[in-house]
Amino acid sequence: KSDARLRFMDPQYGFVTPLARFFTVGFTDEKVRGVRMSPQVEPLLLDDTLKVVLDLQDQWRNAGWVPIRVKDFPSLADTPQWRAQLRDVNKGGTVYWRAGDKYQLMLVVSRFRDNKRPTEERYLITLGIHRSRGVQ
């Protein structure tokens, strides 16, 4: 097994993810179409999940990314309301961010049944990045 880390090297909008075990790059006509990854090497406890997500959101905010579609998909936060929503296996959390007219991303947090630790609440984070589609 080998783990990878995304270093998004845009001079203005760059950020770095934690190590990932799941990491895919999509191509069309030999050009990168998008990246999909899970910025973790195993399903995480809720506290650890929030640390990863909040760090990524801080990096994006500091690099000039802005949250979009916030009426329906507000940024994640470490609040009792968000914790309850993430614990609900039928809800989870999704956020969208945009970097000018260049890029968009979607981050999803989902409850995950981990057969290695069946008595623990574990979570998966999925991150997808692609060129901006103009969604505000």
Predicted regions and their residues:
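A generic structural signal for beta-strand entry/edge sites
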Residues: D3, D29-G34, G92-T94, R122-T126
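Aromatic/basic-lined ligand-recognition segments
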Residues: D78-K116
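Short, surface-exposed beta-strand/loop "edge" segments at domain boundaries and coil↔beta transitions
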Residues: F15-T17, E42-D47, K102-M106, S132-Q136
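Long, charged/polar, surface-exposed segments that mediate recognition or autoinhibition
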Residues: L19-K91
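C-terminal basic regulatory modules in eukaryotic proteins
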Residues: M106-Q136
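A mature extracytoplasmic/lumenal domain signature
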Residues: P39-V41, K71-P74, D101, V109-R111, ...
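N-terminal leader/targeting segments
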Residues: K1-K31
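Generic recognition of long tandem-repeat/solenoid scaffolds
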Residues: L6-M9, Y13, V95, I125-I129
